[in-house]
């Protein structure tokens, strides 16, 4: 599975490798057939209470969440490949899973997006990939693995159909014209659309590009995804539809974007109160 992710240009192979190391620390010599619901629950508890980072401290909630959810990805893929008959991950209730911390959701304003669009950069494939993601909301791993064969036309509308890396679920999205405008001209069906380097390299170039554009924000593909989600809610798309377009399993994560918009409205009213 690690080799498959590397060949497809997906960013998750390092997390998969780390997850394999974690399993060895948690339950040495465990096999796929040994993983049941109790294993999953105990692994989540271990990540949050016993697993230590290189500094000897308990890892952050967000890191524990990431490692825990990669177990779900591994089990889902193993079930698809026929390595296991049943997926014990599906037996977990919400309270038995590690929850993602809400944290702060930053996004780009239209003015900031315009600045980026008007700022050329030497690595145009990275620039195009990021702006494309701002208008379709794909995660970085899905953008890295994207091929021309994943894009189709139906009734004059372009659609993108992929299996999401994070949860192995298929998603089909209509692409707006702005997203299409950032696709490169080269169209080899089986080649990656953007031909991106490693995510570490991508982040370095994104930050340099942001500096060139005069932005005081740390650019990353979570930011492009949050930007897309915020755009949908601002445009008046209902939470259920927005959650499906973003690729969320339910509306709860999508509600965060609605809270962001509500907070911005409150800030705007506060500014008016100060002026008048």
List PLM regions with ranges.
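N-terminal DNA-binding recognition helix of tyrosine site-specific recombinases/integrases
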Residues: 22-23, 30-35, 53-91, 139-141
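DNA breakage-rejoining catalytic core of tyrosine-based enzymes
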Residues: 33, 84-86, 98-115, 167-177, ...
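Conserved tyrosine-mediated DNA breakage-rejoining catalytic core shared by Y-recombinases
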Residues: 91-94, 136, 145-182
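Long, amphipathic, Lys/Arg-enriched alpha-helical "connector/arm" segment
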Residues: 98-125, 135-138, 146
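Short, polar N-cap/turn motifs at the start of nucleic acid-interacting alpha helices
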Residues: 150-157, 216, 237-256
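Catalytic-site neighborhood detector that most strongly recognizes the C-terminal catalytic loop/helix
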Residues: 164-168, 246-271
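Active-site/catalytic core of tyrosine-dependent DNA strand-transfer enzymes
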Residues: 174-216
